[in-house]
């Protein structure tokens, strides 16, 4: 009986290769963060920890797959192990068909009566988007159910919770992107629709990723003045005549988000989200990053914080871990800088976003936050 399952905080760890496990949070509380942390998962050489979150044993999780299916499990159903254990392959836990992969794992509020207050946004490789109430996924059978109907040449590339105070950013392989308000997509009642057009793609282009970006109410003149000021700051120049007060500059800077873009040949850059103007849904979009034979097409684009890290994976099995703060901030109309020197026959095929994993190398007090202790789990990978 589910009521007999003890309520306990768990650290859920997911590897890039599709292995998952849960570990009691208490197993991490005894770990001080003075060095590089502890081993977080025993993985193959080509695998690594790609996602970590803290959840209660009774927290429901939705697993969205590349073919548009959704599966549901509560945390206590996951295999429990030690911090060093590899976990269990999701393909052996969920009724996945051949070639079907899990693209998004979403922990949800335990109180399902609140789900009707939350929305979920879908994005497909053909540029379609759809918004539903999260409550539409409160009942999911053991064999899963359709989350979104996809054409044979389409795939689900992103799923995220959102509010009507957010924007959606779609990034395409050819270097274009589009940003539009969540409210530009009506709330669908159906799960079998493929949604509406989010971006008008060029021939043979495809959407690689979707990000939910905070909607900012900022005048164009303010935005442009701030960007001139911040660019001058990074160059070490003094630009005092911005027309904005120091308080307003600080306020805009405090709310600034950055979009990280990575290309097939190992190039990347960070760009202020203020550079991505809000447009109407369904347009052709604007330049996100200049693509060429030198840097290749876009493989991923998403919002990042200064303390995050990314992991690049190549088709040759090479891995490189890169702190976000080491990646140059540049404008949209640039090719980026080399993050990883690929060989002639090698390309980056995947980029994992490791949130808040940067290690400052300093000892912390014993009453450090649970999140810091969990993040040290990633440092050893």
Regions found by a protein language model. Give the residues of each.
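C-terminal interaction appendages of subunits in large macromolecular complexes
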Residues: 1-381
């Amino acid at each position: 009986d589910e009521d007999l399952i003890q309520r306990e905080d768990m650290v859920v760890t997911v590897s890039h290769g599709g292995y998952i496990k849960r570990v009691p949070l208490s197993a991490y509380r005894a770990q001080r963060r003075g060095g590089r942390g502890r081993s977080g998962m025993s993985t193959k050489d080509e695998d690594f920890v790609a996602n970590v979150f803290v959840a209660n044993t009774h927290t429901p999780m939705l697993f969205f797959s590349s073919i548009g299916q959704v599966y549901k499990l509560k945390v206590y159903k996951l295999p429990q192990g030690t911090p060093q254990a590899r976990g269990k392959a999701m393909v052996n836990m969920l009724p996945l068909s051949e070639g079907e992969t899990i693209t998004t794992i979403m922990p949800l509020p335990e109180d399902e009566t609140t789900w009707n207050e939350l929305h979920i946004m879908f994005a497909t490789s053909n540029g379609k988007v759809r918004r539903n109430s999260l409550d539409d996924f409160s009942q999911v059978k053991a064999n899963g159910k359709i989350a979104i109907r996809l054409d044979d040449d389409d795939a689900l590339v992103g799923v995220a919770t959102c509010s009507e105070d957010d924007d959606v950013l779609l990034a395409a392989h050819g270097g274009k992107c589009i940003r539009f308000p969540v409210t530009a997509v009506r709330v669908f009642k159906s799960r079998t629709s493929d949604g509406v057009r989010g971006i008008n793609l060029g021939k043979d282009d495809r959407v690689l990723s979707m990000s939910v970006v905070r909607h900012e109410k900022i005048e164009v003149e303010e935005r442009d003045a701030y960007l001139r000021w911040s660019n001058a700051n990074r160059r070490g120049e003094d630009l005092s005549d911005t027309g904005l007060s120091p308080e307003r500059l600080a306020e805009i800077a405090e709310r600034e988000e950055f979009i990280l873009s990575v290309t097939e040949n190992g190039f990347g850059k960070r760009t202020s989200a203020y550079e991505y103007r809000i447009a109407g849904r369904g347009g052709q979009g604007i330049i996100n990053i200049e693509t060429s034979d030198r840097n290749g097409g876009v493989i991923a684009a998403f919002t990042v914080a200064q303390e995050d890290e990314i992991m690049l994976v190549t088709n040759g099995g090479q891995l490189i871990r890169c702190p976000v703060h080491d990646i140059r901030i540049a404008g949209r109309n640039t090719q980026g800088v080399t993050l990883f020197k690929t060989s002639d026959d090698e390309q980056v095929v995947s980029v994992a976003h490791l949130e808040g994993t940067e290690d400052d190398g300093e000892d912390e007090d014993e009453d450090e936050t649970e999140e810091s202790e969990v993040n040290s789990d990633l440092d050893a990978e």
